[in-house]
Amino acid sequence: LQVALDHSDLQGAIKAAVSVGQEVDIIEAGTVCLLQVGSELAEVLRSLFPDKIIVADTKCADAGGTVAKNNAVRGADWMTCICCATIPTMEAALKAIKTERGERGEIQIELYGDWTFEQAQLWLDAGISQAIYHQSRDALLAGETWGEKDLNKVKKLIDMGFRVSVTGGLDVDTLKLFEGVDVFTFIAGRGITEAADPAGAARAFKDEIKRIWG
């Protein structure tokens, strides 16, 4: 279970992190907050949670090596690149994050908009084996939900050799849609952080994950 700190301010993000950090496996410095406050967010999260995996959700499109180094030196283990970034950008990001974080360092590819399985094979060939499948916030607001076409794409990526995380409008009740699919990580943001009891919401997510996947 990964919590996404989808906040616009540092105080809100840190307050949410403290409320649920011990209940989740991975803590994500969200894109909007990183744009507001920079990689300082990763540094604060690392100081609060020295043993957790910290993700910088930069959605990096260019300058991969520089962006990855800047976040990794602040404590990020994983960083995201957008799927339309060039292979050299992704490779530079991977090299930089591994230089700082060792084997713990990884790049995740964010699947937004148009992408192909042919491109995905190039990411694997470049040494990147994590992908994040989205239902975007805007798509969800437009009324789209998780369907068979999404699940089939997730399954194909897994069959190719990716560890696939899923995100977008997830709650405890939607987890069962993925039964039988070897999802790597479920990423939830406001579904956890804006709950009346965030820690309880995180525990409910984890209980349902354990119930379905054991």
Indicate residue ranges for each PLM-predicted region.
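Conserved N-terminal beta1-alpha1 strand-loop-helix module at the mouth
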Residues: L1-G65, V73, E194, A199-D207
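Short, small-residue-enriched loops and turns at beta-alpha junctions
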Residues: H7-Q11, T31-Q36, C60-A63, A85-P88, ...
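C-terminal helical cap(s) of enzyme catalytic domains, especially alpha/beta-barrels
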Residues: A93, G147, E179-V181, G191-G214
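Conserved anion-binding
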Residues: A63-G161
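Hydrophobic faces of well-ordered beta-strands that scaffold small-molecule active sites
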Residues: L1-L5, I27-A29, I54-T58, M79-C81, ...
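A C-terminal functional module that forms or caps the active site or interfaces directly
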Residues: E148-V181, T185-I192
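Well-formed, non-transmembrane alpha-helical positions, independent of function
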Residues: S19, V44, N70, L122, ...
